[in-house]
């Protein structure tokens, strides 16, 4: 049976925290920023955790993490 490989796109987008939760970057922060308010852009900084409903999919993409 072949090795289970991590999806390269998931490898670039997600990081697994020591507790087992997964963190991801915020969306909507790449372009068309002029019409977004300063408050909105500030709140999009940093990273957030992956929601529980998506955790199974993310875990399936990263079997070795």
Swiss-Prot record:
Keyword Nucleus attached: no
Similarity remark: Belongs to the bacterial ribosomal protein bL35 family.
Lineage of the organism: Bacteria, Pseudomonadati, Pseudomonadota, Betaproteobacteria, Burkholderiales
Gene Ontology biological-process entries: translation
Region Disordered, residue ranges: 1-25
Molecular function in Gene Ontology: structural constituent of ribosome
Skewed-composition ranges (Basic residues): 1-16
Gene3D superfamilies linked to this entry: 4.10.410.60
Alphabetic keyword roster: Ribonucleoprotein, Ribosomal protein
InterPro entries for the chain: Ribosomal_bL35 (IPR001706), Ribosomal_bL35-like (IPR021137), Ribosomal_bL35_CS (IPR018265), Ribosomal_bL35_sf (IPR037229)
Name of the protein this chain belongs to: Large ribosomal subunit protein bL35
Pfam families the record matches: Ribosomal_L35p
A cellular-component GO term for this protein: cytosolic large ribosomal subunit
Gene name in the database record: rpmI
């Amino acid at each position: 049976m072949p090795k289970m490989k991590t999806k390269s796109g998931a490898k670039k987008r997600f990081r697994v925290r020591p507790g087992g939760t997964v963190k991801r970057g915020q969306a909507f922060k790449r372009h068309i920023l002029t019409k977004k308010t300063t408050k909105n852009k500030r709140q999009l900084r940093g990273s957030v955790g992956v929601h529980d409903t998506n955790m199974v999919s993310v875990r399936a993409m990263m079997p070795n993490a």
